[in-house]
Structures are given as structure tokens and as C-alpha cells.
């Protein structure tokens, strides 16, 4: 079983330089790992068994299995209630009149592993875009400043390069920050879109699936219909048509066991709650981002919290001189640079910025 999940190990690698935030990582790391693991779990027939087993008189089992796998199986919604073994064979499996009674086909069954993998790709797209747009800028600026044991000569040289870059490119980082904000918005749009996509995939059953499962546990046994048995039945029906000896069409009703649905029902209960939590956190993250863009005072407080070792006057001066793009880059640097070195960077930036301010005041008199 552990060999099956070997391909997921690469996603567990911790990046040396952080270019995003925790909510962002929940999308492209946690969610992608979860979806790929689920996809591999469903795909691993050798560990779980045959995906479908059908029985019907006079039809070879292999033929029936293949036919029902291709054309999908169905249940009868009117037969979801009743005593198993007396009124119905299993919930949703009972006698019906073809063409009159409503039947529900479960066409999703053979596509679950592919859809889960496709969802994992979609969750990685914003990360891929941001990594391409970011272009390794933070990594180049951090260099070895994330190590507390770097020697003084090397530290001073690289710190000077960083400060010179920042002063020389002041007010030129808005587009850099804007592209990250776009990727954050894409994360939110993606997770909301995924909820609707899975709802469409499961024929409108996903949007209320988790809440229905919770309600099911609170109802009396004789009053409840198991939503997991409705959406992911373990036993279904399959109708096979063939020509008889006289050339007439014969109809054969078969029972099919869908063993993977015992896994699928748990997977989608988990995904329902995970997507809800992820969408709420992503929404809060967007509100936070809007507040950061619109509030210079909030940016000052956040930078102060990030550089607690620096003097408050120096932090205030730097925050006031930075626009949103400069602030964002400086804040991201604070996540990756050693706190003591970051304090010195803030101090050097403050000194350079105050020096530029004094020079600007002196120029009219010098002229």
C-alpha cells in the first residue's frame, strides 16, 4: 500500500524559501496531496478488489461485469425505504416497471479516480501561475540571509545588495504583488467552482451531502434514509438485453455489487467538509487582503509584528515610504530572513530612506 502513495512524497517537500502563505499552501499542498491520495486509493484495484461484480442467470459473469461497467448501473429511488430482505434487496434495489418507475443511473462510478486527479491539477494551477510569475525573485533576494550562522562579511555584502536593490526599485513592485493577489482570488474561485463541479458530477447530490449525512445521524432509525446509500449505493441493478432463440429481445435483471462505493462515500464526506472549510478560510483570506491593500495603518501594524526586534520609529518610516507592492515584498522577506538580520535590514532601509528624504529637502537650497 505504501508503494501506491510514493508519488505523493514530492509534494511533501518543504520549500527553503516561502513565497506564499498558509492558506495558499492548503490549496496546492494539502488539498492536492489529499486528492491524489484518494485518486490512487480508488485506482488501486489490486488492494481493494474488482470494481464491479454482477450476477444474473444465463449470462456469463465476465460479460455482465463488463456490460454493466460500461453502461452503468441504476437504483430505484422509490425503493430507498423499506425493510432490507423483505421489501427490498438493498436500499434502492427492488422491483420496478421499466418505462414507468423512475430510475437513477450512477454514471460517476468509473470516473471517480480521473475526476479526483483532474481536481488535484486544478488546485495546483494558481500555485503554478504564481511560481512562474514570481520567477525566483524572493529566493535571489534572500540568498543566505535565512541562516543565523552566516559570517559577518558575507552577511554584510548580501544585506547591502538587498538594501540597494530595494532602494533602487522602490515603488516598482505593485505588479509583483498584484499577481499574487490574483492567484489568491483564483484559489477562492477554484474551490467554489470545485463544489459546483462535484455537485454536477454527482448529479446534484454533493451540495447538501455533508449536511444530509449529519442530519441522518440525528434521526430515528425508522424515519431516516441513508444519504450515503442514496448517492453511493453498494448494491445496484443492471438490465441486460439480448436476443433469444426465436429472435425476440430478452431482458435480464442483474444485481451488481459496487465495492468501491464503500470508499467513495467516505471520500466525498471528507471532501464536502474540507471544501467548505477551505472556501471559508479562502474567503477570510481575501477579506484580509482587501483590508491590507486599503489600509496603510494595517500594513504598518503587520510589518511591526513581522519585525518585532526593530525600532518602532524605523518600522514606521519604512512602512510610510513603501507602497503596497514594496510592503508585500518586504513582508515576504521577513518570513524568510533570520529575525536578527531582518532587524538590520529594516534599520538600513530606514537610514537610506531618511537620507533620501533629507537630500530631497536640501536640493532646492543647493540649487
From Swiss-Prot:
Induction: Expression in embryos at ectoderm/endoderm boundaries during gut organogenesis is induced by activation of the wg signaling cascade.
Cytoplasmic side stretches: 1-22, 131-179, 288-367
Alphabetized UniProt keyword annotations: Cell junction, Cell membrane, Cytoplasm, Developmental protein, Differentiation, Gap junction, Ion channel, Ion transport, Membrane, Oogenesis, Transmembrane, Transmembrane helix, Transport
Disruption phenotype: Female sterility. Only one third of the zygotic mutant embryos survive up to the first instar larval stage. These mutant larvae display a feeding defect most probably caused by a keyhole formation defect during proventriculus development. The feeding defect may result in larvae death by starvation. Zygotic mutant embryos display large holes in the head region and a variable spectrum of segment defects. In maternal and zygotic mutant embryos, epithelial tissues and organs are severely affected, the cuticle fails to form and extensive cell death occurs.
GO cellular component: apical plasma membrane; apicolateral plasma membrane; basolateral plasma membrane; cytoplasm; gap junction; lateral plasma membrane; membrane; plasma membrane
Distribution of this protein across tissues and organs: In ovary, expressed in inner germarial sheath cells, prefollicular cells, follicle cells, nurse cells and oocytes. Expressed in embryonic epithelial cells. Expressed in foregut and hindgut from stage 11-17, segmentally repeated tracheal placodes at stage 14, salivary gland at stage 16 and proventriculus at stage 16-17 (at protein level). During germband extension stage (stage 7), expressed in epidermal epithelial cells. Expressed in cephalic furrow. Repeating epidermal pattern emerges at stage 11, refines to one or two cells at each side of the segment borders by stage 13.
GO biological process, one term: phototransduction
Pfam families: Innexin
Function: Structural components of the gap junctions. Involved in gap junctional communication between germline and somatic cells which is essential for normal oogenesis. In embryonic epidermis, required for epithelial morphogenesis. Required for keyhole formation during early stages of proventriculus development in response to wg signaling. In follicle cells, promotes the formation of egg chambers in part through regulation of shg and baz at the boundary between germ cells and follicle cells. In inner germarial sheath cells, required for survival of early germ cells and for cyst formation.
PANTHER family: INNEXIN (PTHR11893), INNEXIN INX2 (PTHR11893:SF41)
This protein's name: Innexin inx2
Lineage per the UniProt record: Eukaryota, Metazoa, Ecdysozoa, Arthropoda, Hexapoda
Designated gene of the protein: Inx2
Amino acid at each position: 500500500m505504501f508503494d501506491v502513495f510514493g508519488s505523493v512524497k514530492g509534494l511533501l517537500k518543504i520549500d527553503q524559501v516561502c513565497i506564499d502563505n498558509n492558506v495558499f499552501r492548503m490549496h496546492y499542498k494539502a488539498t492536492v496531496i489529499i486528492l491524489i491520495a484518494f485518486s490512487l486509493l480508488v485506482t488501486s484495484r489490486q488492494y481493494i478488489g474488482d470494481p464491479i461484480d454482477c450476477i444474473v442467470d444465463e449470462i456469463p459473469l465476465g460479460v455482465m461485469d463488463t456490460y454493466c461497467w460500461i453502461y452503468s448501473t441504476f437504483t430505484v429511488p422509490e425503493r430507498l425505504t423499506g425493510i432490507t430482505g423483505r421489501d427490498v434487496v438493498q436500499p434502492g434495489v427492488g422491483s420496478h416497471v421499466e418505462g414507468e418507475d423512475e430510475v437513477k443511473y450512477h454514471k460517476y462510478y468509473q470516473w471517480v479516480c480521473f475526476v479526483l486527479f483532474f481536481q488535484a491539477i486544478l488546485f495546483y494551477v494558481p500555485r503554478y501561475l504564481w511560481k512562474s510569475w514570481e520567477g525566483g525573485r524572493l529566493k535571489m533576494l534572500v540568498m543566505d540571509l535565512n541562516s543565523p550562522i552566516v559570517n559577518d562579511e558575507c552577511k554584510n555584502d548580501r544585506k547591502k545588495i538587498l538594501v540597494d536593490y530595494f532602494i533602487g526599485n522602490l515603488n516598482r513592485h505593485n505588479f509583483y504583488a498584484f499577481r499574487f493577489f490574483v492567484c489568491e482570488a483564483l484559489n477562492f474561485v477554484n474551490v467554489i467552482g470545485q463544489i459546483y463541479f462535484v455537485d454536477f458530477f454527482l448529479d446534484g447530490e454533493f451540495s447538501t451531502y455533508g449536511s444530509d449525512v449529519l442530519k441522518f445521524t440525528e434521526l430515528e432509525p425508522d424515519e431516516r434514509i441513508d444519504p450515503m446509500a442514496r448517492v453511493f449505493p453498494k448494491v445496484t441493478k443492471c438490465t441486460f438485453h439480448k436476443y433469444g432463440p426465436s429472435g425476440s429481445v430478452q431482458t435480464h435483471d442483474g444485481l451488481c455489487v459496487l465495492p468501491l462505493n464503500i470508499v467513495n462515500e467516505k471520500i466525498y464526506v471528507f471532501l464536502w467538509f474540507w471544501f467548505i472549510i477551505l472556501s471559508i478560510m479562502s474567503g477570510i483570506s481575501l477579506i484580509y487582503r482587501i483590508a491590507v491593500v486599503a489600509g496603510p495603518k494595517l500594513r504598518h501594524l503587520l510589518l511591526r509584528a513581522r519585525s518585532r526586534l526593530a525600532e518602532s520609529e524605523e518600522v514606521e518610516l519604512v512602512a510610510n515610504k513603501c507602497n503596497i507592492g514594496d510592503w508585500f515584498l518586504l513582508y515576504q522577506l521577513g518570513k524568510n530572513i533570520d529575525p536578527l538580520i531582518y532587524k538590520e535590514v529594516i534599520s538600513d532601509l530606514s537610514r537610506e530612506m531618511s537620507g533620501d528624504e533629507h537630500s530631497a529637502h536640501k536640493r532646492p537650497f543647493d540649487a
